[in-house]
């Protein structure tokens, strides 16, 4: 059930009324039920994957929170089990094709069937959110959550599960534990964000998409100027699509009394690649900084090691965006560009989510 669908426009007023008419002590249960119902609206059986990730990280964090010399092993096992569904559903065919391409010139043939299952909606987002919670418990940034209902809602919270933003436990769990009464001003702000997000997605992105697709589908017959204009329009299209959906998620959450992180901050006004990543998909940039870049050593090491840490972080970013060489190369280009900026001291920092500092 996408926010720009007719089904959601019919369902949300009912969700809104049911949520605020429900006694506060039962609202978490109601919201959890709604979140799973919304998720099962896509492919019902995939709710089992959501449940797997929830129970794996909930149980893993409980074990990790016990001070033990084997905590690193526990974190490794729990982390692998958490990311296993993501690796299987999103990257199985990609890895399968790589193995095939390597073995074929060697005249070695291993027949491995291609998987034809659809990738579960939002698996990249809720898997990263769950892993982030696990890592925060491991690094003693937060205490483990003992209330399974609250934790399950943190992972499955329906406004953000399909396309983010990726929330941290320290930001969202306290809000789940202290649900508020109806706030008219906050709800008004939420509706404004929802409508602006709808405009960006439906009016801007979807309309531009029609033009961009018509050019790219017949690119061999297009002039250089047409391809240039289509590329500019595509930049606006992906911004409207992603930022619009993020704004809708933030707006829906705000109507229900929750505050989610702002995911975009005028990215095309950035003054450098580094600044761009402080403004574009901010919640992912923060996640990569906290759970990839800093654990690798961040900038508190030699220059060469720091450059490698930046490169590895953006390589992970490219892989996360899609199981395709295009995304991997895209991640490498951004990583190399940011390394060049750092080496030549061309960075201009604006914002708080800095990859390149730790």
Region roles according to the model:
Residues 1-357:
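Membrane-embedded transmembrane alpha-helical bundles that form the catalytic cores
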């Amino acid at each position: 059930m996408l926010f720009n669908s007719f089904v959601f426009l019919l369902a949300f007023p009912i969700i809104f009324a049911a949520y605020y008419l429900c006694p506060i002590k039962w609202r978490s249960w109601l919201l959890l039920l709604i979140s799973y119902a919304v998720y099962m609206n896509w492919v019902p059986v995939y709710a089992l994957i959501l449940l797997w990730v929830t129970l794996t990280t909930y149980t893993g964090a409980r074990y990790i929170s016990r001070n033990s010399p084997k905590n690193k092993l526990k974190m490794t096992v729990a982390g692998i089990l958490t990311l296993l569904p993501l690796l299987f559903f999103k990257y199985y065919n990609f890895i399968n094709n790589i193995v095939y391409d390597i073995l074929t010139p060697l005249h070695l043939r291993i027949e491995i069937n291609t998987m034809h299952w659809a990738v579960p909606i939002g698996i990249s987002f809720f898997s990263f959110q769950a892993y982030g919670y696990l890592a925060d418990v491991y690094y003693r940034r937060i205490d483990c959550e003992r209330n399974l209902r609250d934790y399950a809602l943190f992972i499955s919270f329906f406004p953000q599960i399909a396309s983010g933003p990726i929330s941290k436990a320290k930001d969202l769990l306290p809000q789940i534990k202290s649900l508020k009464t109806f706030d008219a001003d906050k709800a008004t702000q939420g509706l404004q964000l929802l409508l602006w997000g709808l405009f960006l997605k439906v009016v801007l992105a979807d309309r531009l998409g029609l033009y961009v697709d018509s050019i790219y589908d017949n690119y061999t017959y297009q002039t250089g100027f047409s391809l240039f204009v289509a590329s500019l329009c595509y930049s606006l299209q992906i911004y409207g699509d992603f930022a619009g959906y993020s704004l809708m998620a933030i707006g829906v959450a705000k109507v229900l009394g929750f505050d989610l992180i702002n995911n975009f901050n005028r990215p095309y006004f950035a003054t450098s690649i580094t600044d761009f990543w402080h403004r574009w998909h901010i919640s992912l940039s923060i996640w990569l900084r906290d759970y990839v870049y800093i654990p690798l050593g961040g900038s508190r090491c030699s220059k060469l090691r720091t450059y490698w840490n930046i490169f590895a972080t953006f390589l992970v970013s490219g892989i996360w965006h899609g199981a395709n060489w295009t995304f991997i190369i895209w991640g490498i280009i951004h990583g190399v560009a940011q390394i060049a900026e750092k080496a030549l001291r061309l960075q201009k920092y604006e914002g708080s989510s800095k990859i390149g500092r730790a």
